Amino acid sequence: NYSFFKSKDIKLSRLNSERDINLLIKEKTAKKYVVKISNPKESLVQLEYQDLLIKHLRLNRQLKQIYPKILHNKILFYQDSKQRRCAVRILTYIDGDMYAKSKNTDHTEQSLGRLLALQSTQLQSFIKNQAIRKFEWNPSDIRWTKKFINLFIGNNKNIIKNSIDEYEKFVFKNIKNLKHAVTHGDPNDYNIVVKKEKIIGFIDFGDSIYAPVVNDLAISLSYALMGVKNLYKSLQNIVGTYNKFYKLSDQDIYSLLGLIKSRLVITLVMAAKQRKKYPNNKYLSISENNAWDLIRKLNKVDPYFFIAVIRDICNLEPISEFSKKLQLLKSQQFGNLFDFDLNNVNKKIVNFDKSSFLLKSNPSNKKIDNLVGKFLKKDIGIGLYKETRKVY
């Protein structure tokens, strides 16, 4: 019993959707609605959970207009051509552009950070059993991707492997220290609506799960940072603003980069699996290019440097309890490591990296000693940190 179904002056069009059929209804009055016909595999319990979640978020006055209004009193069912029961829901339509299609500015990014933080805050007071479930797209649970590493070759394989290794260290081993709550689960650039440089809508709660709170920020960043020229500026806008409204803990910051890269790993593994299944689908290759570009950039960033940068953006000291540790070091009297003062001797950097001219012809140990001796003369040699060395 909806008035627009009785009207002859409505326009009907189909919206893009991965799992469901979403129909846009336009009334002559300019009002717009969405009729969501769910995949028959979707459980009624899960759909009712999504409705409850949206209603809870709309209780917050600052967020009320960001989420669609649920118009149905109860979920009804439609029988498709294959005699399958499909749930039908009706919501208001949030009219704007997708974040992915928008020319985003500092103001847009700051708006995103603010609303993600307000959403994180509002979700603290919501919990349902339906949120506690396993989910492939969860960046805090990517161990399953290990068995697909061989879908990649060369440097791409190394990047995927390195990202999974970082997940183990910075996310998996830290997971118990991260605050958990119900999350949106998929604030990607096609689930965020923009108008006039402001975020005006979050949509699609089908991936909502109980997970680390920081997941939503990490997932959003894994899309919002794609294609940006200045990663630091975008991080400053989004993370800096998020932190003003929802304080990130030391542990959140410690795991953030690992979570961003984990979401990118999932994206790339899913794309590789699909490409194997549909080798002639050119769209699959195009759609993952931005993910590769971003993960390659992030792979060049030392995780601890990233942590220090995010701490600085959040107006925190470079490391946890920095002042206390610095004071402790200053209060100690340390002995000399050498019988000379490194500050007062002539010294040179000795490069033993695999690209070093000293190792060009794969020389013997004796020859290396002679080459180094000629290079240093009477100077003290200092090796570089984190070199990929052929010799020690």
Predicted regions located by residue number:
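A cross-family kinase active-site recognition segment
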Residues: 101-156, 180
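Active-site acidic catalytic loop and adjacent metal/ATP-binding pocket
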Residues: 18-29, 34-35, 68, 168-215, ...
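ATP-binding glycine-rich phosphate-binding loop
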Residues: 5-26, 326-334, 363-391
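ATP/Mg2+ or Mg2+-diphosphate-binding catalytic cores
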Residues: 267-360
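A glycine-centered beta->alpha junction motif in the catalytic cores
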Residues: 88-102, 142-151, 266-284
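A conserved alpha-helical element in kinase catalytic cores
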Residues: 37-84, 102, 106-110, 368-392
